[in-house]
Amino acid sequence: MTYNPRDHYFRKAKQENFAARSVFKLEEIDQKFKMFKPGQVVLDLGASPGSWSQYASKMAGEKGRVLGVDLSPVTVKLKNAVFIQADLRDLNLEDIFKEHGFVPPFDIVMSDMAPKTTGIRMTDQARSMELCELALDVARRFLKKDGHFVCKLFHSDDFGKLRDEMKKTFAKVEAVKPDSTRKISKEIFLVGLSKK
């Protein structure tokens, strides 16, 4: 099967006015685990181009809020969302929350962060793992009790270690490869449900 950048999910995203096809990965995960509810406050790490924030914004509704952080700009406009263009590692999150009127803890912390790929599998996997560990650290600090966490990473030999690490923080941890993920992709999503 050849790679088609304009596949069914790409076209569907355009038809439904989502910034990217990745929205359907999050939607599938949510349909499986029922994480999103009206009125939630959501932290979106690696928010660009904005499709995960669009989904979270829609599900959280007018009483909910979304804070997105990414190195790249997010151009979608959402009434209940704020976007910060910065490297997460350089931010004092407490200051950012205060500046934009967010009061942790968050109901959901989600990360679609991905490293700039080098084409060297082990390097890309290690960088992806580092980003997921960074997101997990943020979730441990700012996610409410019983809150949920979703993180994308490239599958590697260290995958099991990260899953075990998440089990210390969450009542249930699941690994998911949504149908909307390209077949050739090494992406997998770790879902942490009900923070202890």
Swiss-Prot record:
- Which superkingdom is the protein from? Bacteria
Against CDD domains, the record matches this protein to: AdoMet_MTases
Task: Name the cystine pairs.
Answer: none
HAMAP family per UniProt: RNA_methyltr_E (MF_01547)
* Positions with a binding annotation for S-adenosyl-L-methionine: G50, W52, D70, D87, D112
Give its localization: Cytoplasm
Function recorded in the entry: Specifically methylates the uridine in position 2552 of 23S rRNA at the 2'-O position of the ribose in the fully assembled 50S ribosomal subunit.
| Family label | Belongs to the class I-like SAM-binding methyltransferase superfamily. RNA methyltransferase RlmE family.
Keyword Cytoplasm (UniProt): yes
UniProt-listed InterPro entries:
RNA_methyltr_RlmE, RNA_MeTrfase_FtsJ_dom, rRNA-MeTfrase_E, SAM-dependent_MTases_sf
Write out the catalytic residues in the record.
Answer: K152
Q: Which UniProt keywords apply?
A: Cytoplasm, Methyltransferase, rRNA processing, S-adenosyl-L-methionine, Transferase
Q: Which Pfam families match?
A: FtsJ
Organism in which the protein naturally occurs: Bdellovibrio bacteriovorus (strain ATCC 15356 / DSM 50701 / NCIMB 9529 / HD100)
Molecular function (GO) terms for this protein are: rRNA (uridine-2'-O-)-methyltransferase activity
Please state what class of enzyme this protein is: transferase
Reaction(s) this enzyme catalyzes, per UniProt: uridine(2552) in 23S rRNA + S-adenosyl-L-methionine = 2'-O-methyluridine(2552) in 23S rRNA + S-adenosyl-L-homocysteine + H(+)
Per the UniProt entry, the Enzyme Commission number(s) are: 2.1.1.166
Tell me the protein's name: Ribosomal RNA large subunit methyltransferase E
Upper classification of the source organism reads: Bacteria, Pseudomonadati, Bdellovibrionota, Bdellovibrionia, Bdellovibrionales
Which GO CC terms are listed, alphabetically?
cytoplasm
